[in-house]
């Protein structure tokens, strides 16, 4: 009976939480109400640090007692590698090509599809009948890859016992967001999550920052692969090729692009009020010139990672960035910039605020933000300790924080499916709904 009450209370929390969140979102959370009961703490933990309880969680809680269940849950969630993955989840993930292909292979498939589509348009423009079957065959090498990325994320969120890892993967993926609808980013999203985000969500922020900076999904999305020193000229072989294909000249990088440098400081690290000026954006963009892709691997059917630093595209001059002179040093300039940004006090404050907003309240207590910022600085950006600080904070467990957050439609869907213990045969049907 207690199992049923726990699951029902979770379902009720989905609805009542919306009303409570609406009332509480207008004011900062301050721990003034009565302490949460142990059952409420358990429900709060699995809803805020996971995607909600499944019936099996209710059974375990009844068998162990809410207090012991909660203690074990919090301990295990901070060590996700110790939690065995269900066999059916492992089998589902093993069947997804997008998780097995390398970056060069993924980009190669995308380019093959683009080339086929371009050829079909050319034939149609000349009054010829395009080979629809051949075109569709090529496109079908790409379409499933985009859908499989979402399938992998949804399947893990529903079935993985490492719920904290899944929630943190969502948080940090959103923090380092890329848009799947831009060029080849869609086929690279799964690799981006798998290689640049997921391994670091309980690791070090600096490692995640570097992994995202060097990933082709980010380099394409924010155009850093197209950012080059002023006056850059392609190699002679490339110039001969372009002379034969003048329609491709528009794709040749022609100058500095500040998109990634701006997002890197404004969103990923310092924050909009992080104490930098437009000149700092420009100088950082100069430091990051040459950070791009070795697309030849995709053209010749190669394998492996695509990131490459091209010294010919790099601005080797000295820069003045955040009040300091940076001498020309090639790729090391960009790595130095990432070191500085990861360790900057404004980054600690920005991430602490965003973290507290995501897991406690839209207007979080300043005391909690300070605790998180102090933890980030003291540990050199250790995200496991950063998360542990959140879980250990009184503000997280306050009555005012309980059911004080809206669930996103994605989170609400996952919580509902988990409460009903449903695993869709094909998650793509849900994503398309």
Model-assigned labels for residue ranges:
Residues 1-4:
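Positively charged n-region of N-terminal signal peptides that target proteins for export
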Residues 28-133, 137, 191-194, 198-352, ...:
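His/Asp/Glu-rich metal/cofactor-coordinating catalytic motifs and the adjacent surface-exposed loops
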Residues 164, 168, 180-188, 221-223:
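Short, flexible active-site-proximal loops enriched in glycine and acidic residues
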């Amino acid at each position: 009976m207690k199992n049923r009450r726990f699951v029902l209370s979770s379902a009720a929390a989905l609805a009542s939480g919306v009303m409570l969140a609406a009332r509480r979102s207008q004011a900062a959370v301050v721990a003034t109400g009565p302490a949460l009961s142990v059952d409420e703490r358990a429900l709060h933990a699995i809803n805020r640090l996971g995607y909600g309880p499944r019936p099996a969680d209710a059974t375990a809680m009844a068998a162990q007692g809410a207090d012991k269940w909660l203690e074990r849950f919090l301990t295990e969630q901070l060590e996700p590698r110790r939690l065995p993955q269900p066999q059916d989840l492992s089998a589902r993930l093993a069947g997804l090509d997008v998780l097995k292909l390398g970056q060069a292979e993924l980009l190669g498939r995308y380019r093959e599809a683009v080339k086929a589509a371009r050829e079909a348009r050319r034939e149609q423009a000349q009054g010829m009948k395009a080979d629809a079957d051949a075109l569709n065959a090529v496109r079908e090498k790409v379409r499933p890859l985009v859908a499989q990325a979402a399938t992998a994320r949804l399947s893990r969120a529903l079935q993985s016992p490492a719920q904290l890892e899944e929630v943190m993967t969502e948080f940090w993926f959103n923090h380092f967001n890329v848009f799947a609808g831009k060029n080849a980013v869609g086929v690279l999203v799964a690799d981006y999550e798998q290689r640049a985000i997921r391994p670091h969500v309980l690791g070090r922020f600096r490692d995640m920052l570097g992994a995202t900076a060097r990933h082709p999904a980010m380099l394409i999305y924010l155009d850093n692969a197209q950012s080059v020193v002023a006056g850059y000229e392609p190699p002679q072989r490339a110039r001969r090729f372009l002379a034969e294909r003048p329609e491709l000249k528009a794709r040749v990088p022609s100058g500095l692009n500040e998109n990634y440098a701006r997002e890197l400081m404004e969103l990923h690290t310092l924050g909009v009020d992080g104490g930098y000026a437009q000149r700092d954006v420009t100088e950082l963009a100069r430091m990051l010139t040459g950070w791009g892709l070795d697309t030849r691997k995709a053209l010749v059917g190669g394998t492996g990672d695509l990131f490459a630093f091209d010294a010919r595209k790099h601005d080797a001059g000295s820069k003045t960035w955040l009040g300091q002179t940076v001498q020309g040093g090639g790729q090391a300039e960009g790595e130095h910039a990432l070191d500085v940004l990861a360790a900057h006090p404004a980054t600690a404050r920005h991430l602490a605020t965003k973290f507290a907003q995501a897991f406690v309240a839209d207007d979080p207590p300043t005391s909690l933000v300070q605790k998180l910022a102090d933890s980030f600085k003291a540990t050199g950006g250790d995200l496991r300790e950063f998360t542990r600080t959140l879980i250990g904070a009184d503000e997280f467990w306050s009555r005012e924080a309980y059911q004080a957050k809206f669930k996103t439609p994605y989170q609400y869907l996952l919580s509902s499916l988990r409460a009903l213990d449903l695993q869709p045969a094909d998650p793509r049907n849900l994503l398309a709904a």
